[in-house]
Amino acid sequence: LTICLVATVNVQAEEGLSVDLNSGRGGEAQRVDDGTEFKVCADQDNLPYSNNKMEGFENKIAEVLAKDLGKKLTYQFWYDRMGFLRNTLNAKRCDVVMGTTPDNDALRTSKPYYRSGHVFVYKKDSGLKITNWDSPDLKKSVIGIVGQSPATIPLNDHGLLGNARPYRMQRDLNLPPSYLVDDVIKGDIDVAVVWGPIGGYFAKQSKVPLEVVMIPEYENENVKGKEFWNISVGVRKADKERIAMIQGALDRNKDKIEQILNEYGIPHVPVVEGDNLMKTYRKGKTQSQEKRGDAIPKTE
């Protein structure tokens, strides 16, 4: 059972933080967009991306965009899991999703504004030296990995399933977003294989020094194990003018956005134009015909 809580938080783009929490109610009047708001659909407890204290890097990037556009930044919060878009963007409770793949069929998207990949995270004093899937130290380590994530493909291809401790794709809301990196710190696992923004941010927050190593791209070996993805802003399909406006703000604030990513420890590499999920899927179908592989796993 998934329990979704909804709240609205108003954030003044230029005058600091003003918070007004209201419970969502059935039969509520549909919001009318008067053009003065930059209203973001976000998770209230999903660092490093967002939370209701405005501490996430997507919160900070949204502040930059709202200020550039001269709009009041507001939020509609909903846990980011099944039904997120249905209950937020598509219900017109908000207008902008700060992080999605650029060819998400449910959205109209901006050009990608950053690109990240999966990382290895391990203690600096562990004596381990891990740079890729063939590293000898990886073969003697307990590896924490999110089940069904793309990184499980190279893990399997390199005969490392016996080393794996799988974690659920959908986080238990009783656990903090840092739970996988926390298990490295506690010594429950030796290495975490995790999406870059999660690994980089929580490693930077850790009092225990951690090593963060970007995993080499695996797409050419097995497209289903693709490690790197472009990330865009998304709006409703019909919102052509809104996404054009947002694109202008993204273009004008590239340096500020990169600074935010760096401050949060988000591993990132140059955007690869034209890299998208459907291209990967088509390539995967070709490889499957040749190798009789399985379907592309869900991304994290």
Named regions from a protein language model:
Residues 1-7:
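Bacterial N-terminal signal peptides
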Residues 14-23, 29, 56-68, 126, ...:
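Extended ligand-binding regions for polar small-molecule ligands
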Residues 14-23, 30, 150-171, 244-300:
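Ligand-binding clefts/hinges and TM-proximal coupling segments of bilobed small-molecule sensing domains
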Residues 15-105, 173-174, 263-264:
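Extracytoplasmic small-molecule ligand-binding "clamshell" domains
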Residues 18, 63, 67, 72-138, ...:
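Acidic, polar ligand-binding/catalytic clefts
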Residues 43-44, 115-127, 204-250, 267-292, ...:
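Periplasmic-binding protein-like
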Residues 44-48, 52-67, 120-176, 191, ...:
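Bilobed "Venus flytrap"/periplasmic-binding protein-like clamshell domains
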Residues 71-72, 90-99, 140-142, 179-180, ...:
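Alpha-to-beta junction loops
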